[in-house]
């Protein structure tokens, strides 16, 4: 089926108490693996690319690959720009065929974050495309965006931010970090409930790679409607390729490397879709 926007997908999740898995993809193999996993579980799914991935492969290339693979399936597939770092990139993604975009102004102060987000929302409304924004700082490193320390999202600021920008979804900081965790993360899960009480748009959890199933499920129960996974998919992909080359160093066919990588990513995505509770929720 054609690509769909994230709006109905996330509103359905909010209404029915589950989250949509959103998976960062780096190449054709990862695109095929994520969609195959979602199709097997009859789950809605979001595929995401970051600015560095877009620089590597271009917006148009990824849009073309995802559109072609989505056309073969009956499940809802959305293509999302993750951590869009400028107004210009967000607009370029819309023009290239992305059906959802994020503008990340969380490194700005509150007023400037509102200003850049509102600017993107105004254009996105003309395209009929939903916008995700971020308030508070998620730790770790995502491409060239780095937080020196976690600053969790304030519920009242979140309420004002959503009202003034008109965003369709909001990524909130509760103690997660991008990349894998060195120690055990301490998540402020009650904060999710507090934000949900005053914000009426779907909430997004970034930095879910490496979180326990218990943590993810509780965050979803408290109101997270979209959960992002990136690092663990990269690791699954790379480890599978390394393993094949260690066992069969004579291998030189990229397709053989791609097959084992796709299987590893698919297995990881299946587990995460079930963790989010969106298996069987394709509409």
Residue ranges of each PLM-predicted region?
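Short, N-terminal intrinsically disordered low-complexity segments that are rich in Pro/Gly
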Residues: 20-27, 52-55, 258
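Extended, intrinsically disordered, low-complexity segments
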Residues: 243-283
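Glycine-rich beta-to-alpha transition loops that act as phosphate-gripper elements at the mouths
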Residues: 25, 79-85, 201-213
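Short active-site oxyanion
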Residues: 19-21, 77-78
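Alpha/beta enzyme core
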Residues: 4-12, 16, 27-52, 59-74, ...
């Amino acid at each position: 089926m054609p690509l769909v926007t994230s709006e109905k997908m996330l509103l359905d999740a909010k209404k029915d108490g589950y989250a949509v898995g959103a998976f960062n993809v780096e190449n054709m193999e990862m695109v095929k693996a994520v969609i195959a996993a979602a199709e097997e579980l009859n789950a809605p799914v979001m595929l995401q690319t970051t600015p560095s991935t877009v620089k590597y492969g271009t917006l148009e290339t990824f849009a073309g690959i995802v559109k072609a693979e989505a056309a073969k399936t009956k499940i809802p597939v959305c293509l999302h720009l993750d951590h869009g770092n400028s107004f210009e990139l967000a607009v370029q993604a819309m023009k290239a065929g992305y059906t959802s975009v994020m503008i990340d102004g969380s490194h700005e102060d509150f007023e400037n974050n509102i200003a850049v987000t509102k600017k993107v929302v105004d254009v996105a409304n003309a395209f009929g495309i939903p916008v995700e924004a971020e308030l508070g700082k998620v730790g770790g490193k995502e491409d060239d965006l780095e937080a020196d320390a976690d600053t969790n999202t304030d519920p009242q600021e979140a309420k004002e931010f959503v009202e003034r920008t008109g965003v369709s979804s909001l990524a909130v900081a509760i103690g997660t970090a991008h990349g894998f965790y060195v120690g055990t993360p301490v998540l402020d899960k009650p904060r999710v409930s507090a934000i949900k009480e005053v914000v009426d748009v779907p909430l997004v959890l970034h930095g879910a790679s490496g979180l326990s199933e218990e943590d993810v499920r509780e965050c979803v129960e408290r109101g997270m409607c979209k959960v992002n996974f990136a690092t663990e998919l990269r690791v699954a992909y790379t480890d599978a390729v390394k393993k094949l080359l260690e066992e069969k160093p004579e291998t030189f066919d990229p397709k053989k490397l791609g097959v084992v990588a796709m299987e590893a990513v698919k297995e990881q995505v299946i587990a995460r879709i079930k963790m989010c509770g969106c298996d069987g929720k394709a509409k």
